[in-house]
């Protein structure tokens, strides 16, 4: 699963996801992509599950690019622990995804296969997404 090799600080504030993505909104690598339509924290496990669904459906043909990286540590306290006594330990990593962000790109497969594969990947994600295609110049 994806996670940073090292970080400056172990824990981060929760924060809020405001506005729309100002970068990563266009296809840069592949012919087809999956664009986020909602703001949400997407976990490393969800990204990995979507990646596996993509590659399995494409039968290892073509190429996949993951355009989001889980760089936010999410902490949680153990179950049945009273409030207070500090913040919990880092539990997993997540990526803050804004609307308009391209999450996955694929290339080297036909349109119908790409649409099916990205639809399967979208089912593994907690947000609404849209299939996008590069416009031929």
Swiss-Prot record:
Organism: Azorhizobium caulinodans (strain ATCC 43989 / DSM 5975 / JCM 20966 / LMG 6465 / NBRC 14845 / NCIMB 13405 / ORS 571)
GO MF, one annotated term: tRNA binding
Gene Ontology cellular-component terms listed: cytosolic large ribosomal subunit
GO process annotations (BP): translation
Keyword field: Ribonucleoprotein, Ribosomal protein, RNA-binding, rRNA-binding, tRNA-binding
Main function: Binds 23S rRNA and is also seen to make contacts with the A and possibly P site tRNAs.
Annotated signal sequence range: none
Family membership noted in the UniProt record: Belongs to the universal ribosomal protein uL16 family.
tRNA-binding in keyword set: yes
Coiled coil spans: none
rRNA-binding keyword on record: yes
Gene name linked to the record: rplP
Subunit architecture: Part of the 50S ribosomal subunit.
Full protein name: Large ribosomal subunit protein uL16
Family matches, as Pfam families: Ribosomal_L16
Record-linked SUPFAM superfamilies: Ribosomal protein L16p/L10e
């Amino acid at each position: 699963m994806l996670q940073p090799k090292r970080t400056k600080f172990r824990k981060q504030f929760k924060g809020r996801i405001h506005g729309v993505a100002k970068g990563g909104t266009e296809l840069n690598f592949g012919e087809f992509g999956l664009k986020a339509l909602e703001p949400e924290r997407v976990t490393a496990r969800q990204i990995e599950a979507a990646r596996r669904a993509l590659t399995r459906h494409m039968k290892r043909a073509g190429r996949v690019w993951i355009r989001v990286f889980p760089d936010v540590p999410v902490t949680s306290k153990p179950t049945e622990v009273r409030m207070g006594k500090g913040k919990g330990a880092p539990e997993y990593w997540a990526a803050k995804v804004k609307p308009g962000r391209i999450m996955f790109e694929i290339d080297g497969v036909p349109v119908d296969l790409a649409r099916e594969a990205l639809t399967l990947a979208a089912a593994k994600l907690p947000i609404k997404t849209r299939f996008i295609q590069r416009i031929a110049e």
